A protein has these predicted regions:
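Aromatic- and glycine-rich beta-strand/loop motifs that create alpha-glucan
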Residues: 1-25
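Short hydrophobic, aromatic-rich alpha-helical segments embedded in or entering the lipid bilayer
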Residues: 3, 187-208
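Helix-capping/transition residues at the boundaries of transmembrane alpha-helices
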Residues: 10, 86-88, 154, 158-159
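Short loop-to-helix capping motifs
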Residues: 13-15, 91-93, 162-164
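Secretory targeting signals
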Residues: 16-17, 21-67, 97-161, 180, ...
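Transmembrane helix segments
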Residues: 29-40, 164-197
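Helix-loop-helix units of permease transmembrane domains in multi-pass membrane transporters
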Residues: 66-105
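Junction motif at the cytosolic side of a transmembrane helix
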Residues: 221-242
Length: 242
């Protein structure tokens, strides 16, 4: 618990993490307002579809939680890196990574729940055709799981690269600008089982894909991707010098 608390404090000290939290909270609600003004019916996924862009904030948090450890500090701090101090304080690299993953998961979970409450309330107030109730709670849990798994996936990639540039660029572009995963579905149906597409089935019911995936199956597939990527990151981290 102490290690998780320490990681939460480190995360809270990062300006980029606060900016990401703001994005995760505000962006989905803003998208919901804009969509409510359109004349197009959004169907069963109204409100929940608006929560998808908020995962950008989760990605940023997952990345900076790891990449900040490798940033070279200022001259007044000796020009060292946080990772050296962290591994000096925590002898076990396994415990260090587990605490960091837990801190990321807790932070992102709280943001997902807060963003879901704000966005779905906004959707209900701005679109009279949409009604959100207790029956949608499993989908809110799905959104939360999707955000957490995406953040952990981003952290795993960053463990390998040690830099936030590559994972941030790829993940954000893939999630918001041009979905490489979706384009790949035009070539092979197996692309539907890539983590971002499979995970969306956790909370969306009208996913435009060539394969029908149940919510639980989508979550398990995405979870497996996270285990594999995080496992590779863990092995690389264990064998590499700080």
């Amino acid at each position: 618990v102490k290690l998780i608390h320490a990681e939460l404090i480190k995360l809270a000290s990062l300006l980029s993490a606060w900016i990401a939290a703001g994005l995760a909270t505000i962006l989905p609600a803003a998208v919901a307002v804009l969509n409510s003004r359109s004349q197009v019916s959004r169907g069963i996924d109204a409100g929940f579809q608006d929560l998808a862009p908020g995962v950008i904030g989760a990605i940023v948090i997952g990345v900076v939680a790891v990449s900040s450890e490798y940033l070279v500090e200022g001259a007044e701090s000796g020009g060292g890196r946080q990772i050296t101090t962290s591994l000096t304080a925590v002898a076990s690299r396994s415990r260090f990574l587990l605490a960091k993953a837990a801190a990321v998961a807790v932070t992102v979970a709280l943001l997902a729940l807060l963003s879901s409450a704000i966005t779905l309330t906004t959707t209900s107030l701005t679109d009279e055709t949409v009604s959100v109730g207790t029956a949608d709670l499993p989908r809110v849990a799905g959104v939360t799981a999707y955000w957490i798994l995406t953040a952990l996936l981003a952290s795993g990639i960053t463990l390998v690269t040690r830099s936030g540039i590559v994972p941030l660029t790829f993940c954000i572009v893939n999630m918001s600008v041009v979905s490489v995963s979706f384009l790949l579905t035009k070539l092979t149906s197996w692309a539907n089982y890539l983590p971002d597409l499979a995970g969306m089935h956790l909370f969306l019911r009208d996913v435009h894909g060539s394969v029908d995936i149940a919510p639980l199956t989508g979550g398990l597939v995405m979870g497996l991707w996270v285990v594999v990527v995080a496992g590779i990151g863990f092995i690389v981290f264990r064998r590499r010098d700080a």
